[in-house]
């Protein structure tokens, strides 16, 4: 009789363990994500995107989206630790979503309830997004954009003309010897202000030119456009002689304050995004993540 009771007890314990295991679809650093949470998140995504009928492939994609959403959420909550998200921030975030969708304030949560969606899953995602926004906000204080980066961005847009100050070195003949000497000269050209006549006088001439980029013709325009100040071009051939261009300065013309601020904001947001992606990628990389739900 004792042996029979032992077998029943072991069998019962095994079934309880199995039931507990099947109710967990993933774990993040030993923090479980339950099947109920997964179904709630999946239902929420479907409700917010007005999805009703799914093909098998779409259902698989939605499963992946829901489980990864919950994993990212868990990582963010663990990153935040004991820091609480104030209720007014949550309320304002919900109002912002309602405003964007032209909904009356207070109607979004009721809409989810009407769709049989647990609002708690939505609130948790709002909280995780607010944690993410706090991370982005803290990163913004460490991001700086240089004038050089602004100039490069404006130049690459091809929407503004540029005034170029450059030194153009031209060989006195087109011999192989002249080509070799011009290559040696190219390696010695570091700054326009440091150029001395003795560097080139025996085999080349130098002309200082100020011109709008749009007025420079042919291949020279492409070469000059790609050069940064105090950077010499490679040696290139023009009319059976060899030339080098050393750009001294570039001045972008007709850029107003609004255009400049737009570029600064664009570059700042780009840097913040890159830093944030690195942080979120490292979160995943360092975390112990197990997915027990079939992908």
UniProtKB/Swiss-Prot annotation:
Database matches in InterPro entries: OMP_Chaperone_SurA, Trigger_fact/SurA_dom_sf
Superkingdom, natural source: Bacteria
First and last residue of the signal peptide: 1-19
Alphabetical keyword list: Signal
Keyword Signal: yes
PANTHER family: CHAPERONE SURA
Protein name: Uncharacterized protein RP673
Organism lineage: Bacteria, Pseudomonadati, Pseudomonadota, Alphaproteobacteria, Rickettsiales
